[in-house]
């Protein structure tokens, strides 16, 4: 996470403008590591 200015932040490959209530969506981040949750391996 990197702050660009007072109202803008960069998380992964997404730039969010906080004054417009944008939110981070991990499903749109190509660099997010997709792992199965721990309960997926328990049967």
From Swiss-Prot:
Domain of life per record: Bacteria
Name of the protein described by the UniProt record: Uncharacterized protein YrzH
Name of the gene: yrzH
């Amino acid at each position: 996470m990197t702050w660009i200015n007072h109202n803008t932040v960069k998380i992964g490959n997404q730039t969010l403008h906080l004054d417009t209530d944008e939110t981070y969506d991990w499903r749109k981040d190509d660099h997010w590591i997709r792992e199965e949750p721990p309960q997926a391996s328990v049967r």
